[in-house]
């Protein structure tokens, strides 16, 4: 979900920094001068929890912000992880990093706050390699069904509503190959939407090709989807993320979102321990600090991300559906998905 990931963060935080941002150290360091080096997305090392961490540890924290998943991987690969202690990326990228030997396992015994993880995030298979944990779930969101509440007084229960000819030319679908094929796989009931068989691919192609005549358009990017929805009397949209709803409301649309019974695609960003970490103890201390419920509260209230520890704050924000999402994993053949998606759009 590389392109959508970039668009999502740009929409939430404005233009992303592509250069290193070094955060000021305390005026007086403690006896042991220590530095934590983090490679992450904007919004994941905020003053609300960063300042407390620096105060508690006396450490300097250097943060580098990545502008895309590819840039993040290149920065890690360039030094075999030696330039960073911590990195953060979503669940679909674990095999890539593990295969490149850029990560090391996390010792759960060093994370007393691990108990704070909400149940749906405590057992995410994608962060495990055998019995070893390689990721700590931190922030999440979804690609939900967005609808006009004037057309739907009650939320649609199934994605099949986007094949209802009654709403022909009043529906939008995101132009993203991997996300589209994955959702199509969920809708047709594939056993694993990220490891499709030839039969699964055939069913997805038939399903999505049959839908094309009902769509007003495919759209690319958060703003494109919001503008097309608001300007054309759209009733239903395969959304690029939760923030499209408040953006539509600002334009006068009575919009809401739902997660249909077939589930929806979910992204789950995690903290990972670099294979080249110089201060492993300090890196684990950061992870443990990020498991504090106060951090989850700030993450959700400031940036509208779902958090993995503070259930009450998620509930207040309406983010109560983590257990109804299919967390992104590495696809069986990304190039095949792109080719199929192009066939569907051309068909």
What is the role of each PLM region?
Residues 145-151, 186-189, 268-279, 298-299:
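A bilobed periplasmic-binding-protein/Venus flytrap-type ligand-binding module shared by bacterial periplasmic
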Residues 93-96, 235-254:
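A ligand-binding cleft/hinge motif common to bilobed small-molecule-binding domains
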Residues 2-19:
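N-terminal secretory signal peptides and thylakoid transit peptides that target proteins
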Residues 32-96:
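Early extracytoplasmic/lumenal segment of secretory-pathway proteins
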């Amino acid at each position: 979900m590389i392109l959508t990931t970039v668009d999502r963060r740009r929409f939430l935080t404005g233009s992303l920094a592509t250069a290193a941002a070094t955060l000021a150290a305390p005026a007086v360091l403690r006896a042991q001068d220590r530095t934590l080096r983090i490679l992450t997305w904007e919004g994941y090392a905020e003053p609300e929890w960063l300042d407390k961490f620096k105060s508690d540890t006396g450490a300097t924290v250097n943060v580098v912000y990545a502008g895309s998943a590819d840039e993040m991987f290149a920065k890690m690969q360039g030094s075999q992880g030696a330039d960073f202690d911590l990195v953060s990326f979503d669940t679909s990228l674990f095999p890539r990093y593990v295969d490149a030997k850029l990560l090391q396992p996390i010792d759960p015994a060093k994370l007393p706050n691990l108990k704070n993880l909400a149940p749906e995030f405590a057992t995410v298979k994608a962060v495990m390699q055998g019995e070893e944990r390689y990721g700590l779930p931190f922030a999440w969101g979804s690609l939900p069904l967005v609808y006009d509440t004037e057309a739907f007084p009650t939320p649609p229960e199934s994605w099949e509503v986007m094949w209802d000819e009654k709403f022909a030319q009043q529906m939008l679908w995101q132009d993203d190959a991997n996300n589209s094929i994955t959702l199509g796989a969920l809708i047709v009931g594939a056993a694993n939407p990220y490891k499709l068989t030839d039969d699964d691919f055939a069913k997805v192609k038939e399903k999505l090709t049959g839908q094309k005549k009902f769509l007003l358009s495919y759209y690319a990017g958060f703003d494109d989807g919001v503008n097309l929805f608001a300007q054309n009397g759209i009733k239903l949209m395969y959304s690029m993320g939760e923030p499209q709803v408040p953006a539509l409301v600002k334009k006068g649309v009575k919009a809401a979102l739902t997660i249909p019974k077939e589930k929806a695609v979910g992204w789950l960003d995690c903290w990972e321990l670099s294979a080249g970490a110089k201060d492993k103890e300090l890196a684990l201390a950061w992870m443990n600090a990020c498991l504090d419920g106060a951090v989850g509260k700030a993450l959700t209230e400031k940036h509208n991300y779902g958090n993995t520890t503070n259930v009450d704050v998620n509930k207040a924000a309406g983010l109560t559906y983590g257990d109804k999402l299919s967390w992104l994993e590495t696809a069986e053949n990304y190039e095949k998905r792109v080719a199929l998606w192009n066939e569907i759009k051309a068909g």
